[in-house]
């Protein structure tokens, strides 16, 4: 992705064959992503969110690498009026990665440099979340 425009796909041999395209040699997935950071802190993103869920943990492996569809267990905190209110757990997030990336409003400067994926917190304008109140 360059300037918000998709430039190409990350394809294993299998997915390249299915799409009648050329492999990019990424059969094991992506291991070296660096997204640009901004001046926003995670607290800034939480305030900008207003109300929603701050995800802090994803559980399981529910991503289709060919279609980008995902369904993952998650946990985090409920946010109301830009303030963390209480923990939430046993929720599910679902959607499509392409659509999710198009919904990024801002990326924070709290980059975790452990591992090969360097990215700050992301604020999405919408996401499908399911769960029940106890």
Please provide the spans of the model-predicted regions.
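Dual-mode signal for accessory low-complexity, basic/Gly-rich regions
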Residues: 1-134
